[in-house]
Amino acid sequence: MSRVVLVTGGNRGIGLAIAKELASRGDTVVVTHRSGEPPEGLHGVICDVTDSAAVDAAFSHVESEHGPVEVVVANAGITQDGLLMRMPEDAFTGVLDANLTGAWRVTQRATRGMMKARFGRLIYISSVVGLTGAPGQVNYAASKAGLVGMARSVARELGGRGITANVVAPGYVDTDMTADLTDKRREEMMAAIPLGRTAQADEIAKAVAFLASDDAAYITGAVLPVDGGVGMGH
């Protein structure tokens, strides 16, 4: 059964892999992007998740073109790393606004239609860093940890309306965001991963597709780590 899916930040990296995976399963997938054209084979809508009006306009466009949004993957996010003592306040608040408050804006708008339909799938892309912490990433880690609390609160609040809310927590993924690591940092990273390799983006995408599927209808408030074991115990 084809569903209408919105993937925020779905024009590159993990988000693009998720969008392609869901489209391959027959869903009508719309990706948000901030500029340019959407990836080939996918529907696109311009949206900045830090702007409530833009989020509302994006949903209105999708609803008018494709129908009510049934599945949302809150993937859009940024990094602005820096040591705690040197991090300017706007580097902290900016990352929180995009990664955490942005997901809240999307969730609030998405659940209007989901509550009427008494069905919805909300999937938040967090990070192992949100569970373990990381030096130089206090802003990013806080934003990704916040998604867990958000998902579990939504799960409790809206579960009676047939809406599930779950989190996928990727570890180190082989994308352009990790391509700039130094050889030394990459060696350290590999040594910390029990499976001894980074993930491929499509491995994250398949986990998301499972949580979006009917097979996961009785799963809500869960955190699914896809991290090669690096975050085990958290």
Predicted regions: what they are:
Residues T107, S143, A151:
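Active-site helix of classical SDR
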Residues N11-R12:
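Conserved glycine-rich cofactor-binding loop
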Residues T132, A209, T220-H234:
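Short C-terminal tail/terminal secondary-structure segment
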Residues R112, R156-G160, A217:
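Alpha-helical segment proximal to the catalytic Tyr-Lys
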Residues I193-I204, D215:
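A conserved structural motif in NAD(P)-dependent oxidoreductases
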Residues L83-L84, P88-L96, M189:
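Substrate-binding pocket helix/loop in short-chain dehydrogenase/reductase
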Residues S127:
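Residue(s) in the substrate-gating loop at a strand-loop-helix junction
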